[in-house]
Amino acid sequence: MTAVQRSVGRSVGAVITGMVAGVALTLVTDVVLHKAGLFPPWGQPVSDGPLALATAYRAAFEVVGSYVAARLAPDRPMWHAMVAGFVGFVVSIAGAVATWNRGPEFGPHWYPVALIVIALPCAWVGGRFREMQLRG
């Protein structure tokens, strides 16, 4: 295996690991909040308050996931953070398209739009944290 192949492999691994970290944190938090009764049972409509909370922790976890991608990157940490963010952006668009007007159990339209809007700024913040860490 050449040095370039190793670098590409590490880059792909960094982005995937960062994304998995963000998704895992989100899913665990979702389950905990459902079990605690702060969110309604699965498949039931969710009001604005819990969705605002979900938006806030998803934003925080997107920053964490992007930071992980940047931290594990072999070089260009911001680029890796933004790639992870772009994938999140695309997945958020796909989720919005798939659930738009599908019923109240998917929440109001502002929620998927918010997830789309925050994806890239959160990725930038995660990458920026890593850049600041590298500068000392």
What are the roles of these predicted feature ranges?
Residues 1-136:
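Juxtamembrane/disordered regions of integral membrane proteins
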